[in-house]
């Protein structure tokens, strides 16, 4: 019977996920995943983007209360913006909550000038992430007060959903709330190569958050959500031989058991390794670059070719491999074949 695990172990795997921050606050990151099977860049990129933009927990202002104001169609003398504009500006306040329960924070200010989110008395449980965000503009000597109710939630909710059973007190105005800490997600898929095969996928994602969590954490949470949802579809038990490969621990990466003649090297590089009796990747990575360059007919071009391939497996020249070579290397290579093919 065909091993069930071949369905997933036969696919190329990567342990290489790189994160590159390109903003001084670390709120923007470039995430690169490679190599992936053809088509998986688009599959994973689209799924991750949808989850990142819809399903993460965050905090937001869900209602406001301004003395003397009963609804959003009002205006306040001495305040440049009407209530509808103030509500739009309040929706742009980005917050982080350190507790799960709702909190009420307060704003008291006197004109003239712009009133910003940083003037809010947030206390210890709520943190304002964009303190320079303008809420309204006041005339000279104009006093302005407002209470803001903050809650933890998911995604985007309308004001009608934030009015708990229509039980908000008179004068408290429910507003739309964007809880999601992820502000934007874009991705693109490029070709990458392993040896002579050039049509593997490279997934490049650009993720920006509001500072509540780092992009790396957001990506991890999105992947965990997908994992939890997809688990429902796994309705079979793994075969014993599949479990055996998983539970028998190796003191080194199973990739080291892969034969070098399976790497699709150039003819020159492959012949040099064969003539030097280098059979497995484990034999190869124990050599230093200097050792390799002393190999007859092996030049810098061949060295760079092999270094690039090893990097795909998170390997390099000059590695210290414990217990290499194992006595039963041929048997182990067969047993772990699904792990690296």
UniProtKB/Swiss-Prot annotation:
Residues 1-237 are annotated as: Alpha N-terminal domain (alpha-NTD). Its EC number is 2.7.7.6. Residues 252-341 are annotated as: Alpha C-terminal domain (alpha-CTD). Keywords: DNA-directed RNA polymerase, Nucleotidyltransferase, Transcription, Transferase. GO terms for cellular component: cytoplasm; DNA-directed RNA polymerase complex. It comes from the Bacteria. It catalyses: RNA(n) + a ribonucleoside 5'-triphosphate = RNA(n+1) + diphosphate. Gene3D superfamilies: 5' to 3' exonuclease, C-terminal subdomain, DNA-directed RNA polymerase, insert domain, RNA polymerase, RBP11-like subunit. One of its GO terms (biological process) is DNA-templated transcription. Homodimer. The RNAP catalytic core consists of 2 alpha, 1 beta, 1 beta' and 1 omega subunit. When a sigma factor is associated with the core the holoenzyme is formed, which can initiate transcription. The N-terminal domain is essential for RNAP assembly and basal transcription, whereas the C-terminal domain is involved in interaction with transcriptional regulators and with upstream promoter elements. DNA-dependent RNA polymerase catalyzes the transcription of DNA into RNA using the four ribonucleoside triphosphates as substrates. This is DNA-directed RNA polymerase subunit alpha. It comes from Rickettsia bellii (strain OSU 85-389). The lineage of its organism: Bacteria, Pseudomonadati, Pseudomonadota, Alphaproteobacteria, Rickettsiales.
């Amino acid at each position: 019977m065909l091993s069930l695990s071949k369905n997933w172990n036969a696919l190329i795997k990567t342990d290489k996920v790189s994160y590159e921050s390109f903003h001084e606050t670390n709120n923007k990151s470039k995430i690169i995943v490679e190599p992936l099977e053809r088509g998986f860049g688009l599959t994973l990129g689209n799924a991750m983007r949808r989850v990142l933009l819809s399903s993460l927990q965050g905090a937001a202002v869900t209602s406001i209360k301004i003395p003397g104001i009963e609804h959003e169609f009002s205006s306040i003398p001495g305040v440049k913006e009407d209530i509808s504009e103030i509500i739009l500006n309040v929706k742009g306040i980005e917050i982080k909550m350190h507790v799960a329960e709702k909190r009420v924070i307060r704003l008291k200010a006197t004109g003239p000038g712009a009133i910003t989110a940083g003037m809010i008395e947030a206390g210890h449980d709520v943190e304002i992430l964009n303190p320079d965000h303008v809420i309204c503009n006041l005339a000279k000597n104009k006093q302005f007060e407002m209470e803001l109710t903050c809650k933890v939630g998911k995604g985007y909710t309308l004001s009608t959903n934030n009015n708990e059973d229509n039980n908000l007190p008179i004068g408290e105005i429910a507003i739309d709330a964007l809880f999601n800490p992820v502000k934007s997600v874009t991705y693109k898929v490029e070709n990458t190569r392993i040896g002579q095969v050039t049509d593997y996928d490279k997934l490049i994602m650009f993720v920006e958050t509001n500072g509540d969590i780092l992009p790396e954490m957001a990506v991890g949470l999105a992947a965990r959500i997908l994992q939890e949802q997809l688990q429902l579809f796994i309705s079979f038990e793994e075969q014993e031989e599949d479990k055996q490969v998983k539970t028998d621990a190796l003191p080194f990466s199973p990739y080291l058991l892969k034969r070098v003649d399976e790497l699709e090297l150039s003819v020159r590089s492959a012949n040099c390794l064969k003539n030097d009796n280098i059979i497995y990747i484990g034999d190869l990575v124990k050599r230093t670059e200097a050792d390799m360059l002393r190999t007859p007919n092996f030049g810098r071009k061949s060295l760079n070719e092999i270094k690039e391939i090893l990097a795909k497996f998170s390997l390099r020249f000059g590695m210290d491999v414990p217990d290499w070579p194992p006595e039963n290397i041929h048997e182990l290579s067969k047993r772990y074949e699904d792990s690296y093919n």
